Amino acid sequence: MGYKLAGCDVLGCVEIDKKMNDVYVKNHNPKYNFLMDIRKFNEIPNEELPQELFNLDILDGSPPCTTFSMAGEREESWGKKKKFREGQAEQTLDDLSFVFIETVAKLKPKVVIMENVEGILLGNAIEYSREIYRRFNSIGYKVMHKLLKGEQMGVPQTRHRVFFIATTLDFDLDNIDLNFNYEPITY
């Protein structure tokens, strides 16, 4: 919703779960809607995709966070195929951040925002974060991450989220300041 409120046009959507996709389409009305696994999207030949999807200003992705959530199974589910709620397809979820980076390599946006839970920075999951950095760097992007806390941003909940921000090497975003100091409105 933030992009919409900021006046951005939402051009496309890739979502495997029909119910989630329906809500997204109703909220954002993307010009191009791909109801499919992102792995299948990445297999579509570039010449079969709308040219508007290449060299975007911003590409945003939020790979499922259940495998990194401190409330979830974490390490026990890593690398295992399972029937998850998303699309009810048997799949692994812990590698979808890397699959999203393959999408970045395909579409070549100027800026990439990828969101996940704070748990991706904790314990053994830190290796996933390091690999995210390595993979972005290997396709010509510099990357940083910011931990944002909802209660400090005027959101009435204590949700902590990590935002990986990647840019092409010629894009200067090194001094981005995302510090918020709103009075918490949690109850």
Spans of features found by a protein language model:
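Accessory recognition modules or surfaces
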Residues: 16-32, 58, 156-158, 162-168
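SAM cofactor-binding core of SAM-dependent methyltransferases
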Residues: 1-42
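Class I S-adenosyl-L-methionine
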Residues: 44-56, 66, 70-187
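Acidic side chains
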Residues: 17, 37, 57-60, 94-95
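Generic enzyme active-site microenvironment
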Residues: 13, 35, 60, 113-114
